Amino acid sequence: MTTDQGIHEHIAALVAEEKSLRDQLASAQITPDDEHARLKALEIQLDQAWDLLRQRRALRETGGSPDDAAERPASVVESYLE
């Protein structure tokens, strides 16, 4: 997942899993508690992936190497103001 394409693919996989969870809940294959817990984890992973893409773009735009970007911890990414 060290390229923009790889990050986008990871995001797509997370979104697909999110949809699958909602479908599983609708068909009573999982409990609402299970869905909620997994969705929260997916949201954090998505926030981290989008943050990494933004870092890479910012580095590229300022003459830096996008490879210097690093995934930030959930505690950092989740404390950003929208």
What are these regions (language model features)?
Residues M1-E82:
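Extended, charge-rich alpha-helical interface modules
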